Curated annotation (Swiss-Prot):
It holds the Pfam family DUF4807. PANTHER family: GH02722P. InterPro entries: DUF4807 (IPR032072). This is Uncharacterized protein F58A4.6.
Length: 201
């Protein structure tokens, strides 16, 4: 059981104790977060609800009642840290995807933009490896193929697309990768027909 004390500037003559019992960790963390963010307001509400005068010290005892099993707090903290880490990776990945897409679109007209898109894609590949999602990683390699084609390395780009398509055909739940391969391949055909962009110095 954990205790939280609260007193006001008025001299206290006695102490009144309350016991808050929780059977759900989400409720417990929500209560503790509210106390941390808005302590004075929260204790004022508690005093008003339980009719506790301000001249009394308030002692709030917090306990988890009858948990279904032994709670592994260390594992929970580790899991939360991992969850936040994965969310940060995902947010960064999609931010880079938006930025890379913009540079890739301009790469059709200026090879300098294609070079920047290739650098952004390299960062995405590193993040995808940390993220551990092979589908996202495969799509990043397709972005690399597109940048290579825009820079004039069409044969290398075609080889990348073929390798990713072969991998996708051999693995389940990769329909989106196969469709991406088909789309990128059509883009490569257009570059082959109309040529790559020049570099504007």
């Amino acid at each position: 059981m954990n205790s939280i004390k609260h007193s006001t500037e008025i001299p206290s003559t006695s102490t009144q104790s309350l016991v808050f019992e929780f059977t759900n960790l989400d409720d417990l963390y929500g209560f503790l977060n509210i106390l941390q963010c808005r302590e004075e307001y929260s204790f004022a509400q508690i005093r008003a609800f339980y009719n506790i005068p301000v001249d009394k010290k308030l002692l709030v005892n917090i306990q988890v009642k009858n948990p279904a099993q032994n709670l592994d707090y260390a594992w929970e903290r580790r899991l939360k840290h991992h969850f936040r880490y994965m969310l940060d990776l995902e947010k960064l990945m999609w931010n880079l995807s938006t930025l890379g897409g913009a540079y890739s679109a301009m790469g059709d007209f200026d090879a300098n933009y294609a070079k920047v898109a290739a650098k952004i894609t390299a960062h995405q590949i590193n993040l995808a490896k940390k993220y551990g999602d092979p589908v996202i990683l495969a799509r990043c390699y397709l972005y690399t193929a597109l940048a290579e084609a825009q820079l004039g390395n069409l044969s290398h780009a075609v080889n990348i697309v073929r390798a990713i398509y072969h991998w996708a055909k051999q693995n389940p739940n990769t329909d989106i990768v196969q469709r991406c391969c088909e789309g990128v391949y059509q883009k490569l055909r257009a570059i082959h027909i109309f040529g790559k962009a020049s570099s504007n110095k």
